[in-house]
Amino acid sequence: MREKLSLWAIFCLVVAFLPSQTESVAVMSVDLGSEWMKVAIVKPGVPMEIVLNKESRRKTPVAVCLKENERLFGDGALGVAVKNPKVVYRFLQSILGKTADNPQVAEYQKHFPEHQLQKDEKRGTVYFKFSEEMQYTPEELLGMILNYSRTLAQDFAEQPIKDAVITVPAYFNQAERRAVLQAAHIAGLKVLQLINDNTAVALNYGVFRRKDINSTAQNIMFYDMGSGSTTATIVTYQTVKTKESGTQPQLQIRGVGFDRTLGGFEMELRLRDHLAKLFNEQKKSKKDVRDNLRAMAKLLKEAQRLKTVLSANAEHTAQIEGLMDDIDFKAKVTRSEFEALCEDLFDRVPGPVKQALAAAEMSMDEIEQVILVGGATRVPKVQDVLLKSVGKEELSKNINADEAAAMGAVYQAAALSKAFKVKPFLVRDAAVFPIQVEFSRETEEEDGVKSLKHNKRILFQRMAPYPQRKVITFNRYIDDFVFYINYGDLSFLSEQDMKVFGSQNLTTVKLSGVGSSFKKHSDAESKGIKAHFNMDESGVLILDRVESVFETIVEEKEEESTLTKLGNTISSLFGGGSSEPSANVTEPVTDEEEVTPEAGKEQDQPEKQEETVQEKPETEEGKEAEPQAEEQKEDKEKAENQGETESEKTEKPEEKTTDEEKEADMKPKLQKKSKISADIAVELEVNDVLDPSAEDMEGSKKKLQDLTDRDLEKQEREKTLNSLEAFIFETQDKLYQDEYQAVVTEEEKEQISGRLSVASSWMDEEGYRAGTKLLKEKLSELKKLCKGMFFRVEERKKWPDRLAALDSMLNHSNIFLKSARLIPESDQIFTDVELKTLEKVINETITWKNETVAEQEKLSPTVKPVLLSKDIEAKLSLLDREVNYLLNKAKFAKPKPKDKAKDKNSTSESSKANSTDDAEKVIPPKTEDGAEKVKPAEEPPVVEEKAEETILELNPAENTDDKTESTESSKSENHIEDEL
């Protein structure tokens, strides 16, 4: 009984952990650019695919239009921007995580004077004020856009999606990254990771060229010029050995250079201003076109088109109908004029390359190729200047410049999701900005003079790999104190970049409870105050915890024999163990070196970092080689364990003599060092950009949910309005069709026609202002009125097919019944009851059909029919069930054995003839299907072998009926596997 219960418990446990069939398994990525976004998904059956928007385009403008009663996104929002630019918000990336006094906020206001930016007095950031009721922060607007991207992905995937990987520029600092995470939280998205867009591009490049990656390092530079910024990245590809998955390819970010404001949008603004100047010079209007916001929006749209055309043509004519005051504009612009307008921008093209080389401490001779990414790299002058600066023969264009980041990010999303299994590809991203810890400590000189000494400890050097955990130990504090988390040396940034960067001070950390922990453990030796830091996969620095660590010496119990240990372990499993909670003194003490300001790059100091506990071996940090210190520690432990094992082997189970016992008593007891840790209370004070409070976040989520509900209500109303309008017009037309006129009386026809006319008039006068509820009521009333007419028409349409099917079934059933009754009694497999039951069903069905059809023919077409399609289907189902029952019985019936005694006793010729006839009538036994398959000339079917490593194990199981196919077909038709 106990065994049965155990098996049942295991079965329930297994079922509990099986994935639900309705559970969402699709994941998405959003390549969030300054002007455009690309969305990609992974789902079962669709390995990696770019999502098409409602206009069937592969990229969508990052724009949202907020009118008083509706929202528009993407291309719809851009269409409104030409007519009413005040209600359209775009290029939000440049003001995320920025305070009101940041130069980029002023630059944004200059480019978009139609918007009214106000300072948030609580956080110091900005928000858009359209009216007293309509005020939105950049995070809220970005949250709307991210929610729209999820809507596109869900429509494309045909299932709900909540997990996403979002790209951000590599130069985003802590405040900017937190702002994107806040926007995603407002949108209700679960962010698996914020991945740098240059890293996503590098991952996409490596995934599709993994066969070309070997142990020899390959250095490749990606030059990405988008709409708003430019980034140059040096990436090293090579294979490395890992404990979890053997030798795997790896990419490592070695150097990053960037220019925050160099991009295609700045070129378009120069063209826009040039076109405005040309229009003013034509003097067709006394007004200055630059004072007209709508006209400037039209000029910007034309400048965007003009830039694209001039990339392929030497000259082109810009033209806009009704630019201002119904005046048309037309002017010719040459490529040379465009290049002259942007000359200073082209001079900045080599800048990011030089920064990346300096960060990586490499030269261009070590770079194998330079690959172009981003739409603005299509400008010929950009390519010419870049080619000269890198000194290569050519620039590579062997990846999709627009979609590479989205595809790399969605690969990472699949790797982070538990629903997919992907081929491992190790990613070592790098922190662009160094981070350090600063604190002050009172010191006493030899002459007794006390002074305050300011100390710095580097947490993450420039280009330090992450995700990574670090521990800093404060050894000389015995009371509460304060330390600061700040950015490190940013001298590599220009003066303008430093202004845009914002505050260099990240967080003030106030510790309390240090003194009380020392008093509590006064008899133990202090090992310092340890602060545990974690830079996660998104590049966001988190202070996990702070603890006060003490070391104490405890007497170790005498070594127990192996059998005693085993007995204690088994007894504890069955309730014999102690019920008291274990104390926090069980961890062995390990010396953690304090991070010093002289520390080199993180990859050169592996002993000073704490290994991150991994849950998924596919992620980057879990696949990296163990640090040197960890290996030394393992070797030491292994040696100790080996020594213990040898000592145990030498022990004998013989009883000790009295002298031995005395000698054992005289031996000193073993002593062991144990660690005691006490958590320290932490108070964090953010110094760069304050995060929204929990109350503000809930308010933002409610604000967006209200807008979403309003949009859904509007869509529902429009859908109901269209349905009502279509029903009126279609029904009015049907009243004049022959099949409908045949089933209605003149009185009924006039009633329906009159009600439809009244509803049509109401629609023209009041319907377009009516609410959804009233529209649904009107539609329901009309459908109820016409229900009888539609029912009669539908029934008459179904009769021919249904009756023909019934006649066919009756015919086949009769033939089957006659054949069954012709079977000799000695071979009969059906009972009389079974055959009589089938005969009864056939006769009753024939009688019902004849009587019902005859009754229906007497009725007028305008009354409710007695011959109903559902009744015919019920009769069909009953006949089919009875016949199938007998067919299945015949299929599995065993032939009766031959009567040998009767054949032996037969003496007359006639008897012999009869017995021979009987023998001929015996049905031979059916051979098993499996026996027919295995023939001498053919191999038996085998289980299919997978040619490659399985990727995405989420295809629906194949139909088991297909297993009866031949061996050749089973070998040729392998399972289709989604491969990333």
From Swiss-Prot:
Which portions of the chain have biased composition (kind: Polar residues)?
Answer: 907-916
Give me the ranges of the annotated region Disordered: 558-682, 894-980
User: Could you tell me which CDD domains the record lists for this protein?
Assistant: ASKHA_NBD_HSP70_HYOU1 (cd10230)
The secretion signal range is 1-24
Q: Which GO terms are recorded in the biological process aspect for this UniProt protein?
A: negative regulation of hypoxia-induced intrinsic apoptotic signaling pathway
Q: Which SUPFAM superfamilies match?
A: Actin-like ATPase domain, Heat shock protein 70kD (HSP70), C-terminal subdomain
What is the superkingdom listed in this entry's lineage?
Eukaryota
Q: Which UniProt keywords apply?
A: ATP-binding, Chaperone, Endoplasmic reticulum, Nucleotide-binding, Signal
**Cell compartments where the protein resides:** Endoplasmic reticulum lumen
Q: Where is this motif: Prevents secretion from ER?
A: 977-980
Query: What's one GO MF term for it?
Result: ATP-dependent protein folding chaperone
Q: GO terms for CC? A: endoplasmic reticulum chaperone complex; endoplasmic reticulum lumen
The similarity comment for this entry is: Belongs to the heat shock protein 70 family.
The record's function comment reads: Has a pivotal role in cytoprotective cellular mechanisms triggered by oxygen deprivation. May play a role as a molecular chaperone and participate in protein folding.
Q: What is this protein called?
A: Hypoxia up-regulated protein 1
Q: Give the organism, scientific name.
A: Danio rerio (Zebrafish)
Question: Lineage from the top down?
Answer: Eukaryota, Metazoa, Chordata, Craniata, Vertebrata
Corresponding gene? hyou1
